[in-house]
């Protein structure tokens, strides 16, 4: 991620947009509560400031949730979304950088604040939204659901850890320059944050909050995406590559050269394939591990303009297309597109509630 630059004119416009009034509601209240009691995908529509709900049994949009803050204003430019289940409760965490990141991670402004939104995934009610000192990339629950982790995207990089019940700040962790996505390994033993200006990944012990390793990767890493088999896949925007990290040893196992700017990387264990979105060309490329940390490209799937996030549910993969305002449903076995689902404007993050 390149250094954030000042742009006073844009900041003024965004300040006006943030002030646009709408129907007021308080934290924990919803204009009309939903009853999403079925397996669903939740898609964040950045420009629309909504969540599209896709019923997985029919692959159709069955509901739309407006994102409103406690003062009754639209929550502008939500980004990524994560789910946590505790017993029968399902909650969603949404990171809100407050600006359009669909073209890349440049253009932020000093003084820009971020936000975290916590939502009940069944009713659609916003449980809490709270402002952050600096813009963030995402917000994610800790593996046990007791904490919410989020980054601060500036040169004095930090990860903030909040209590998921009281929403009070518990810990501030110093990481590299301009951290972006915060993620956890599949086994929950380590947290990762990609430092775009440092070209590193910070590895954090979730219990002690100590940085236990700093891993050098390629240019402008954005997210370290978890996979089964003890690996993390890091998408490096500027070097147009994927770095493969070993969770146990913290070693950088090697680099997959893509020759396109990656938007997201997701590993499908059943097919033993790594899917990487190619936003520029509206495709997803898929790679197979040939052994010895050697990955070979096996094909491409045409999805839609500005392909971005990828998520798997059984036999199907789901890809958000920011430029097409759709979600593509892909048959994992045949790599054939099943359908395109129209959603809101500039869809970005996607997550499942099963």
Residue ranges and their predicted role:
Residues 2-10:
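Bacterial N-terminal signal peptides that target proteins for export
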Residues 19-22:
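C-terminal motif of bacterial Sec signal peptides marking the signal peptidase cleavage site
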Residues 24-354:
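Predominantly soluble domains enriched in secretory-pathway, periplasmic, or organellar proteins
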């Amino acid at each position: 991620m390149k250094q954030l630059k000042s742009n006073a004119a844009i900041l003024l416009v965004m300040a006006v947009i943030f002030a646009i009034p709408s129907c007021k509601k308080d934290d924990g209240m919803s204009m009309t509560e939903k009853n999403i009691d079925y397996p669903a995908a939740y898609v964040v529509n950045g420009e629309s400031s909504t969540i599209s709900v896709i019923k997985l049994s029919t692959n159709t949009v069955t509901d739309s949730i407006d994102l409103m803050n406690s003062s009754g204003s639209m929550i502008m430019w939500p980004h990524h979304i994560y789910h946590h289940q505790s017993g029968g409760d399902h909650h969603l965490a949404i990171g809100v950088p407050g600006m359009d990141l669909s073209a890349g991670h440049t253009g932020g402004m000093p003084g820009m604040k971020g936000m975290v939104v916590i939502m009940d995934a069944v009713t659609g009610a916003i449980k809490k939204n709270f402002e952050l000192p600096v813009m963030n990339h995402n917000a994610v629950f800790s593996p046990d659901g007791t904490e919410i982790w989020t980054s601060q995207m500036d040169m004095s990089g930090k990860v903030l850890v909040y209590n998921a019940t009281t929403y009070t700040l518990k810990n501030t962790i110093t990481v590299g320059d301009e951290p972006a996505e915060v993620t956890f390994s599949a086994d929950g033993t380590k947290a990762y944050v990609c430092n775009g200006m440092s070209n590193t990944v910070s590895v954090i012990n979730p219990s002690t909050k100590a940085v236990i390793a700093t891993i050098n990767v390629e240019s402008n890493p954005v997210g370290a995406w978890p996979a089964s088999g003890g690996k993390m896949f890091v998408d490096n925007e500027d070097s147009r590559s994927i770095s493969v990290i070993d969770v146990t040893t913290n070693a950088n196992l090697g680099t997959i050269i893509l020759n396109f700017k990656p938007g997201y990387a997701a590993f499908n264990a059943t097919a033993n394939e790594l899917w990487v979105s190619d936003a520029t060309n509206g495709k997803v490329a898929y790679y197979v591990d040939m052994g010895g940390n050697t990955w070979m490209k096996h094909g491409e799937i045409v999805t839609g303009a500005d392909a971005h996030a990828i998520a798997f549910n059984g036999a199907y993969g789901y890809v958000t297309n920011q430029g097409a305002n759709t979600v593509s449903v892909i048959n994992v076995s045949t790599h054939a597109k099943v359908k395109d689902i129209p959603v809101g404007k500039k869809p970005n993050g996607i997550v499942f509630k099963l």
